[in-house]
Amino acid sequence: MAEDIEIDLDDLERRMKGAMDSLRAEFASLRTGRASASMVEPVQVEAYGQMTPINQVGTVNVPEPRMVTINVWDKGMVGKVEKAIRESGLGINPQTNGTIIMLPIPELNEERRRELTKVAAQYAEHARVAIRNVRRDGMDQIKKGKANGMPEDDQKFWETAVQELTDKSIGNVDQALEAKQAEIMQV
C-alpha cells in the first residue's frame, strides 16, 4: 500500500502559479502613472444590451508613456465607452476626438505613490497566503501518506520538495512586489 502513495507536486505547483497569475493581474490593475492597455481591461461597457469588456468595442493602444487611446469601432458606442471609463473609478478623465477616446494619465504625487505601494504589498501578502495554503494542503497529503504507511524517507523527501516549491513561489512573489514598488515609486 505504501508504494501507491504519491504526492501530486504538479498540482501544487499549478495552484501556486495560479496565485502568482492572480497577483500579476492585480498588479496590472494598479495605476502607476504609466500608461498600459491593461489599465482599462476591467472596464465593462454596456454594448448591445449586455456588459462587454472595453477591448471588444474598440482597439486599445498606448501611443505615449502617459496616454492610452481607444479607437471605438461603432461611432454610436463612443458615449457609452466614455461613460464607462468615467464611472470605472480609474480617476481618468477621457477626451473624445471623433471615434478616438484619449485617456491622459496624470502623474502621481508622492502620497499616492506610497498608498499604491501599500496596496501592492497587500496584494502580495494575499498571494503569499494562497501559496501557504497550497503548501498546507501538500503537507496534509504527506500526513495522510504517513498514516497509510509511507516510509519516513519518502515523507522527508516530499516535505522537502513541497517546501522548496513554496520557497520558490514566495520568492517569485517577493521579486514581483519589489519590481512593482520600484515602478510605482519611479517619477
Curated annotation (Swiss-Prot):
MF (Gene Ontology): ribosomal large subunit binding
Keyword vocabulary terms for this entry: Cytoplasm, Protein biosynthesis
Spans through the membrane: none
SUPFAM superfamilies hit by this protein: Ribosome recycling factor, RRF (SSF55194)
Record bears the keyword Disulfide bond: no
Chief location bin: cytoplasm
Entry's Gene Ontology BP terms: cytoplasmic translational termination
Location in or out of the cell: Cytoplasm
Gene Ontology CC terms, in alphabetical order: cytosol
Gene3D superfamilies: 3.30.1360.40, Ribosome-recycling factor (1.10.132.20)
Entry's family note: Belongs to the RRF family.
PANTHER family on file: MITOCHONDRIAL RIBOSOME RECYCLING FACTOR PSEUDO 1, RIBOSOME RECYCLING FACTOR
Described purpose of this protein according to its UniProt entry: Responsible for the release of ribosomes from messenger RNA at the termination of protein biosynthesis. May increase the efficiency of translation by recycling ribosomes from one round of translation to another.
Protein name: Ribosome-recycling factor
Organism: Paracoccus zeaxanthinifaciens
